[in-house]
Structure formats: C-alpha cells, structure tokens
Amino acid sequence: MDISRLSQTEKCNLAIELGERAAKYFDNDAIKSQVADALNLAKMWNESEDAGELLYDFLDNEEHGFTIYQENEEDKIKINAWNCVIDAIAFVSKMAYLESGIKYLPEPIEIVDDDIFDHMENALRLCRN
C-alpha cells in the first residue's frame, strides 16, 4: 500500500486499525482495557485540543505507560504487539499535536513519520509467526 497517497485522516484510521489488530494478542483484561481506551481516544484525535498530550500519556507514563509494559514483557508475540500499538498511538498523537498547532513535540513523537507503517505491519507479521 502506498501510504503517501493517503490523507492524514486515512493514515490515522489505518494506524488505529493496525493497533486494534495488535491488541488482540494481549490477554490481560486490564491491559486490553487500557489499550482500548487509548485506541478509542485516538479515533477522536482531531476533536480535542489536548488529544496529542492525552495519547502521549498512554505511551510515556511512569505508572501505566505502554512503553513500560513493553519493557517488562517477555513474550515475543506480545512485545511485537506492543510495538504496533505504541507506533499506532505515537502516529496519531503526532497528528493530533500538529492539528492543534503545537510547535514543540515530545522528542519520541517528533521523529514519527510515515515509515512507522512499515514497522507496524512488520510487527503484526511477527505476531502471527
């Protein structure tokens, strides 16, 4: 798929769809619920001025951040699922920040670009293998 032909909204929708596919690999109910909350917020990325920050908080939070969960995970399938979910939320977070006019982004979000879709798709492939 040629990502460059998609609009920003279509890219966000694709990222969310890939994140939802990856979320199916989690079996902990609390984690599944938190991921679902993040993906539901992502679906409203352009409806709230602080959506970028709220989405980023799901990624980088000392108590319940997705990156912390990923670092503590030992199951390779779930690590790859986290890769996809984190990438999806990061991409949508960046679009939400940009939509709201924020000029200075958190460093991990600043480097996000369309190449992240290759990483998400590869992570999903690794989940299935």
Residue ranges and their predicted role:
Residues 2-129:
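Structured binding/interaction patches within domain cores
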